Amino acid sequence: MSTTVAAGATPNVTPVFPLILLETMRDMDRPDEYLEGEDIAVSMPRRLGLSDVVFKQIHRFREEVKKKRMQSPATVVDLISLVIRRPDADEIFEEAGRRVAQRAWKERSGAFRRTVRWLPQGAKQRSARKAAMKLFRQLAGDGSWEVGIKPVSLRITGSLTAVADPGGAACAFYAGVLSELVTEYTGRKHSATHAKCEARGGGTCEWLTQVQA
């Protein structure tokens, strides 16, 4: 059962979200992927990343980022709805999430990052949770959310991705953000399991991180 919550119009989502999502889609679309005898039904949605429309949207959101102008959840949901048509949608969403987390990490000062690297693992986890709380405040839209610890986890009710994608593939975006953020702060590779999915009938969306072997 898919969620029926509608995306709101109040600007409360960072423009980094739609910008990185579009840039990731563009980067995954390369001319050398188009082979003779290709299945047009599959390849046409992929070519959207190289279209003039997408390039114009990327330019638009770059300007929005410069101006630090928050976006409405409805705007982001519209873009998510465009990406979920693609056969590689889950890959795009997860990679976009990783890039958002990497950007947030790199925006911290060099001194801060070096200090975090020297902290014991428990303190690193707490720092990761604090950073996640700050970041998801700008990514969750109108959804209610919380970030847990031991392990670092995320729970969102009424998430943008569940609203936009009844299939649940878009939820890979939040998995990518959470896993990469914890990876950067702890210095240990993490993945995120989507334990519950609101779009697939769960009462909420929940992601749990774990260290990769």
Each PLM stretch: what is its role?
Residues M1-S153, L160-A169, G201-T204, A213:
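N-terminal accessory segment detector
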Residues G143, V147, Y185-K189, T193:
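Long, hydrophobic, amphipathic alpha-helical segments used as structural scaffolds
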Residues R155-T157, V177, E198:
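Non-catalytic recognition/regulatory regions in large multidomain proteins
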Residues A172-G187:
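Active-site helix/loop of acyl-thioester processing domains in fatty-acid/polyketide metabolism
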Residues A192-V211:
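Beta-rich nucleic-acid/ligand-interaction surfaces
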